[in-house]
């Protein structure tokens, strides 16, 4: 009897874990590889706190990992991890880490930390230098339009856009 109970329990747990990862993949810009905890990796392993507090983005370390909404984030230090854990949403990029300009035009494109802007204490990422320059021409319109569009595409799979 124990084996019969254990197998369905393990199957259910695995199904739920995979469903959470699949959901995160559609709503967050995550790396395909899984972390040591089995969850997808956010911001390509870059420390989200460093985007606000360091001179340049810093790569995180798996030693300092924190999960938020089914996604793991790496941090450069224990202090950065603690800062994040005190208020995760204050340090995460808008639109799940997808390119803000992409969201503005109804797409979920990769967000690259090399092309980032912080406006009103909110982090916005962009897919490349050309798109970032286009955004700089009319920041307010792009940000406002992206926030309006996000409600429509937030739960839409990337492959459907």
Model-derived features: positions:
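Mature extracytoplasmic domains of secretory-pathway proteins
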Residues: 74-75, 81-85
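Bacterial N-terminal signal peptides that target proteins for export
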Residues: 1-10
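Intrinsically disordered, low-complexity terminal tails and linkers in eukaryotic proteins, enriched
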Residues: 2, 23-69, 89-161
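Cytosolic histidine kinase catalytic core of two-component systems
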Residues: 78-79, 130
């Amino acid at each position: 009897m124990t084996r019969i109970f254990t197998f369905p329990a393990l199957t259910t747990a695995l199904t739920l874990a995979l469903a959470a990862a699949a959901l995160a993949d559609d709503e967050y810009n995550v790396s395909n590889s899984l972390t040591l905890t089995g969850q997808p990796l956010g911001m390509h392993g870059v420390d989200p706190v460093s985007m606000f507090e360091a001179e340049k983005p810093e790569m995180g370390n798996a030693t300092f990992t924190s999960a938020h909404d089914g996604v793991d984030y790496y941090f450069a230090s224990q202090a950065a991890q603690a800062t994040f854990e005190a208020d995760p949403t204050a340090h995460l990029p808008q639109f799940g880490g997808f390119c803000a300009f992409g969201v503005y035009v109804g797409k979920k494109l990769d967000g690259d930390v090399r092309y980032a802007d912080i406006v009103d204490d909110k982090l916005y990422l962009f897919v490349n230098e050309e798109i970032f320059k286009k955004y700089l021409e009319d920041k307010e319109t792009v940000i406002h339009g992206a926030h309006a569009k996000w409600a429509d595409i937030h739960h839409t799979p990337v492959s459907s856009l």
